[in-house]
Regions:
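Hydrophobic alpha-helical transmembrane segments
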Residues: 9-17, 42, 65-76, 119
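Alpha-helical membrane segments in multi-pass integral membrane proteins
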Residues: 68-79, 89-110, 116-137
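A structural feature that tracks compact, well-ordered secondary-structure segments
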Residues: 20-26, 32-35, 105-108, 134-138, ...
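Short, small-residue-biased leader/transition segments that mark boundaries at the very start
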Residues: 1-6
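Extramembrane terminal tails and long inter-domain/linker segments of multi-pass membrane proteins
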Residues: 141-151
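Helix-adjacent hinge/juxtasegments
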Residues: 33, 37, 41-68
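Membrane-helix interface "capping/anchor" motifs
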Residues: 23-31, 82-93
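Membrane-helix exit/interface motif
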Residues: 19-26, 45-59, 76-83
Length: 151
């Protein structure tokens, strides 16, 4: 993991999502609070798993440990996915694809399969694209006070 990825993942993936989660708490949105703060902390912990060993402050985690960690996040995400079933279809798809992504990445780590890792990466692009579309739709629909992009 390069330094640019560590910076991006720590601040945009981690800190920004934690702040978003805290703002969702202010809005009394339990789902948004749990999802954003949890995934923000995921990114900070994932970066720490890569950075701390590089600094000599912790041992390098085994691929089995990383795989198990990703399985735990897959299970957590599957549980959150159940909370999206009364939400817009696009949000459901983001969480379904995120669940699949965590499991594919964990299988890739546990088996060492490059093919599964590549499939996981492609699936991650799909998940990220859906999330970007959802964010754009939320912003445009609010700004124009009408459904400009369906969700």
């Amino acid at each position: 993991m390069g330094s640019e990825m560590c910076i991006r993942d720590s601040f945009y993936g981690g800190l920004a999502q934690i702040i978003a989660g805290l703002l969702e708490a202010k809005n009394r949105n339990t789902f948004g609070t749990v999802a954003f703060t949890s995934y923000g902390l995921f990114w900070l912990s994932f970066v720490a798993m890569k950075v701390l060993p590089a600094l000599g402050l912790a041992p390098e985690p085994s691929t089995a440990a990383v795989g198990a960690y990703l399985i735990a996040w897959g299970v957590f995400t599957a549980l959150l996915t159940a909370g999206t079933f009364k939400s817009p279809r696009t949000l459901q798809l983001v969480f379904i694809t995120l669940t699949i992504l965590f499991f594919l990445l964990s299988i890739g780590d546990l088996t060492g399969s490059t093919k599964i890792r590549v499939i996981g990466g492609l699936e991650g692009i799909l998940c990220g694209s859906l999330a970007i579309y959802l964010a754009a739709a939320d912003i445009l629909n609010e700004v124009y006070e009408k459904k400009t992009l369906p969700v």
